A protein has these predicted regions:
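Short gly/ser/thr-rich secondary-structure transition/capping motifs
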Residues: 16-24, 147-150
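Non-catalytic C-terminal accessory region of glycerolipid acyltransferases
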Residues: 2-6, 94-241
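Catalytic core of membrane glycerolipid acyltransferases/transacylases, capturing the structured
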Residues: 2-3, 7, 16, 30-90
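Structural motif corresponding to alpha-helix initiation and N-cap regions
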Residues: 23, 71, 93-96
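A conditional alpha-helix N-cap/helix-loop micro-motif detector
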Residues: 19, 89-93, 123
Length: 241
């Protein structure tokens, strides 16, 4: 549609002024949905950069904080893009149901498993929403790592260009043994998603997952799932989704 083309053109124009974008792993993007696009989140620029990294025919649905719903400019744009507004202060079952319905209709659903923008320029402990959706919808997950977006704001303020990267990993699915996981098993699924994102990123971004035995196993080409289960048992409990 014309609006989609204009939005992409605007993002590309801004990018041309302030930096460059390299996309790695385009061959890993599925031809069609449904699937979950799980990405790290360090900058307000991440969503539009993901949008222009993806093929134009892929309409990406996504969660957005409720505060944007009535924004004069971004509100209408987000509604056009298919945003599902979510209350991030609680488990928003209404938003989760809408996301599951979208996946059931074949959508590509993008979200940051961390649930918010990281303020420490590295991965923070994720919430269980992405794992919940993937397990309930039975869809694959495409991990995405955004590189150098944490530098964008500072560099723009100092009129410096930023060389950005979108790194797309191979799609994967939760283990066949997982059926409607809860508790430790759901936390293990979340850990599995996050180490797949971490594996795409430079080590300086690993953050909360830097010492994960599961990440170490994945990087060695081994099955990380047993280590994910072990790690989840020692994790800080989260509210049940």
């Amino acid at each position: 549609m014309l609006i989609d083309k204009l939005e992409r053109a605007f993002v590309r124009l801004v990018l041309l002024l302030f930096g460059s974008l390299k996309i790695v792993g385009l061959e890993n993007i599925p031809v069609e949905g449904p699937y979950i696009l799980a990405v790290n989140h360090m900058s307000k620029a991440d969503p539009p950069l993901v949008m222009i990294s993806w093929p134009p025919m892929a309409k990406i649905r996504f969660f957005a904080a409720e505060k944007w719903e009535k924004h004069l400019i971004f509100g209408p744009l987000m509604r056009h893009q298919g945003a599902i507004y979510i209350n991030r202060g609680e488990v928003d079952r209404r938003a989760l149901r809408q996301a599951l319905a979208a996946l059931g209709e074949g959508a590509v659903f993008g979200l940051a498993p961390e649930g918010t923008r990281s303020r420490v320029a590295a991965l923070i402990q994720a919430r269980d929403g992405a794992a919940y959706l993937a397990s309930r919808a039975g869809v694959p997950i495409v991990p995405v790592g955004m590189v150098n977006t944490d530098l964008l704001g500072h560099n723009m303020a100092h009129l410096r260009r930023t060389h950005l990267e979108t790194r797309v990993g191979q799609p994967f699915s939760l283990p066949d043994t997982v059926h409607r996981p809860k508790g430790d098993e759901l936390a293990a699924c979340t850990h599995l998603i996050m180490i797949h994102i971490a594996a795409l990123l430079p080590e300086r971004y690993w953050g909360f997952y830097a010492d994960s035995p599961a990440l170490e196993a994945l990087l060695k080409g081994e099955d990380p799932w047993p280590a994910c289960l072990d790690v989840s048992k020692a994790a800080v409990p989260q509210p049940e989704t």
